[in-house]
UniProtKB/Swiss-Prot annotation:
Active-site residues, record numbering mapped to chain: 143
Keywords: Methyltransferase, S-adenosyl-L-methionine, Transferase, tRNA processing
Enzyme type, top EC level: transferase
Keyword Transferase: yes
PROSITE patterns associated with the record: SAM_MT_TRMB
The UniProt record lists the keyword tRNA processing: yes
PANTHER family listed in its UniProt record: 3-DEOXY-D-MANNO-OCTULOSONIC-ACID TRANSFERASE/TRNA GUANINE-N 7 - -METHYLTRANSFERASE, PENTACOTRIPEPTIDE-REPEAT REGION OF PRORP DOMAIN-CONTAINING PROTEIN
Cellular component terms (Gene Ontology): tRNA methyltransferase complex
Positions contributing to S-adenosyl-L-methionine binding: 68, 93, 121, 143
Reactions mediated catalytically: guanosine(46) in tRNA + S-adenosyl-L-methionine = N(7)-methylguanosine(46) in tRNA + S-adenosyl-L-homocysteine
Organism for this UniProt entry: Paramagnetospirillum magneticum (strain ATCC 700264 / AMB-1)
Protein name: tRNA (guanine-N(7)-)-methyltransferase
Domain of life: Bacteria
Length: 238
């Protein structure tokens, strides 16, 4: 197990972040959402040694808490929140344009009761979460960092899987998707090798994917022209 798994309550050192935090200039409405709605939904960066109880981030009782790493435009997370009002959804994203997009969905669909946003690197939040506190984690179409010299920037890694294994409940799900063949092979190798995870599904057949797995905008646009591969792994019983 990695050091984060062994010491889940250790203070998270701020990791180096690679990627954009802002794209095109935000329009007035989007800026208004960032200024007015985001503060009401934000999960603060934990203090050293702070524990963050995910279920207590929501105003009402939730049956489970699910977390999405890098939610992009927020379509997937918003659909899950709408379909599962008794589930708390935490979306982690640093890209302000994507955050504004999710906030638009939250406002239009009135999802403020079961959506929370961590607008920072998810690696700052995960160490503060208690063992077995999440029911599902989603890592959908992360930056593949296809060059070999950038392999250490890929989110799926033995160390990250240690952390996810710690915070997922027994039987909890890790859902991963990518359309980059290098990342697909990388993710499959590390997921298959990790003793805490059991493979349930690995397919490029969208019809074989569970019905409660909404498509992301990236997937719908099919930017690369390559068929995505979908992985579903289950956290083995402790």
């Amino acid at each position: 197990m990695g050091k984060h798994a062994e010491n889940g309550n250790a203070a998270a050192e701020r990791p180096r972040f690679f990627g954009r935090r802002q794209g095109k200039a935000l329009r007035r409405n989007a800026l208004g959402l960032i200024e007015d709605l985001l503060p009401r939904l934000t999960v603060a960066v934990p203090e050293p040694d702070e524990r963050v109880e995910p279920a207590l981030l929501f105003p009402g009782a939730v049956r489970s808490v699910w977390l999405e790493v890098g939610f992009g435009g927020g379509e997937h997370l918003a659909q899950l929140a709408e379909d599962n009002p008794d589930i708390g959804l935490i979306g982690c994203e640093v890209f302000r344009n994507g955050i504004a997009s999710l906030l638009g969905h939250v406002q239009a669909r009135q999802l403020g009761n079961n959506v929370r946003v961590f607008p920072e690197d998810v690696r700052l939040l995960l160490p503060a979460l208690p063992d077995g506190s999440l029911g599902r984690v989603f890592v959908l179409f992360p930056d593949p960092w296809p060059k070999t010299r950038h392999a250490d920037r890929r989110f799926i890694s033995p160390e990250t899987l240690d952390v996810l294994a710690r915070v997922l409940e027994s039987g909890g799900e890790l859902r991963v998707a990518s359309d980059d063949p290098i990342y697909v092979a990388w993710a499959a190798r590390h997921l298959d090798a990790h003793p805490a995870f059991e493979k349930i599904l690995a397919t490029a057949d969208r019809s074989a994917v569970p019905a409660d797995w909404p498509a992301t905008r990236y997937e719908q646009k099919c930017i690369t022209g390559r068929a995505p591969v979908f992985f579903l792994y289950r956290r083995r019983a402790r």
